[in-house]
From Swiss-Prot:
The lineage of its organism: Bacteria, Bacillati, Bacillota, Bacilli, Bacillales. Its EC number is 6.3.3.1. One of its GO terms (biological process) is 'de novo' IMP biosynthetic process. The keyword Cytoplasm applies. This is Phosphoribosylformylglycinamidine cyclo-ligase. Belongs to the AIR synthase family. Pathway: Purine metabolism; IMP biosynthesis via de novo pathway; 5-amino-1-(5-phospho-D-ribosyl)imidazole from N(2)-formyl-N(1)-(5-phospho-D-ribosyl)glycinamide: step 2/2. Signal peptide: none annotated. Pfam families: AIRS (PF00586), AIRS_C (PF02769).
């Protein structure tokens, strides 16, 4: 084989080795409906195996944002893939769909097989938690576009739901109970602000031991985004949900209204759930208001469910049976707008 391409910065052999290394991780995500294996021109999935009468496909794509820079700094790459999966499948399940399969896109400055394997391992871990198959992807070595130790990671997921069961939020009404599911921390949003406040301005490092966190700052920041697929599917199967919102960039103020029909709003009871200490640390070091925090971060709640009053106890029991802590954090109100009671300006 000619060395011309390698001399230009693209190592084909390293790419082949990376693919071979990732195969075992891909294989453990296999599920019913997947046709064929890794290496084809596209991934195939047989929808007829789901037994849906009027299937609706629900798709989502997302990335990990500048949380990747924390992974670069820590030289730890085996969990960032779960973040990519979580950001996609959580967006799908809030629409009532079961995630079926996932594809990843990884662009890097230099193909290092061990690093690529670690990244894909994290993707496969996320797929296993979500119950979806990793059926394909693209790994692109792009010298000159990225530095040798840099990469970007994005994901694409597709799910399916019976048309009649599509969760649109149109049936949410005043009086519905808002149930919050705890986050695992920052998840994958707000990291540009986090880096400025904690690393740049406060002078902390990823090795800083934070007593309030009980771990190093790096360990806290790289905690993977939580995947909520299985507990939500359990609630959906019983018809318990009127709506659901994945709390990502924009926090409570931007994400909860996305599930609401016109004519209603929400009132959140601040203090009705425990807020992880990472948010207090960011507030203290950055001099941020509570309004700033709720406009930017998930504040310890990664998923908000709207549940009819007469079903909320059953929903809480179902969530608990599926390993989820859950908190009643507020109500749907008859007046449009988002009110978080008890926070300062």
């Amino acid at each position: 084989m000619s060395n011309a391409y390698k001399e230009a910065g693209v190592d084909i052999e390293a790419g082949y080795e990376a693919v071979n290394r990732m195969k075992r991780h891909v294989e453990r995500t296999a599920r019913k409906g997947v046709l064929g294996g890794l290496g084809g021109f596209g991934g195939n999935f047989d929808l007829s195996t789901l037994g849906l009468k009027e299937p609706v496909l629900v798709s989502g794509t997302d990335g990990v944002g500048t949380k990747l820079m924390i992974a670069f700094m820590a030289n730890k790459h085996d969990t960032i893939g779960q973040d990519a999966v979580a950001m996609c499948v959580n967006d799908i399940v809030v629409q009532g769909a079961e995630p079926l399969y996932f594809l990843d896109y990884l662009a890097c400055g230099k193909a290092v097989p061990e690093k690529i394997e670690a990244i894909v391992k994290g993707v496969a871990d996320g797929c296993e938690i979500a119950g979806c198959a990793l059926i394909g992807g693209e790994t692109a070595e792009m010298p000159g576009m990225y530095e040798e130790d840099e990469y970007d990671l994005a994901g694409f997921s597709v799910g399916a739901v019976e048309k009649k069961d599509l969760l649109t939020g149109e049936h949410i009404q005043a009086g519905d109970v808002l149930i919050g599911l705890p986050s695992s921390g920052l998840h994958s949003n707000g990291f540009s602000l986090v880096r400025k406040v904690l690393l740049q301005d406060a002078g902390l490092t990823l090795q800083t031991e934070c007593a309030t966190l009980g771990k190093t700052l790096g360990e806290e920041l790289l905690t993977p985004t939580k995947i909520y697929v299985k507990p939500l599917l359990a609630c959906l199967k019983q018809g318990l949900l009127a709506g659901a919102a994945h709390i990502t960039g924009g926090g409570f103020y931007e994400n909860i209204p996305r599930m609401l029909p016109k004519g209603v709003g929400i009132h959140i009871d601040y203090g009705s759930w425990p807020i992880p200490p990472i948010f207090s640390l960011i507030q203290e070091k950055g001099g941020l208001s509570e309004q700033d925090l709720f406009h930017t971060f998930n504040m310890g709640i990664g998923m908000v469910l709207a549940v009819p009053e007469d079903k909320h106890q059953q929903a809480l029991a179902t969530l608990e049976a599926n390993g989820e802590d859950a908190y009643i954090i507020g109500r749907v109100t008859p007046t449009e707008g988002t009110v978080i009671g008890g926070i300062g300006a």
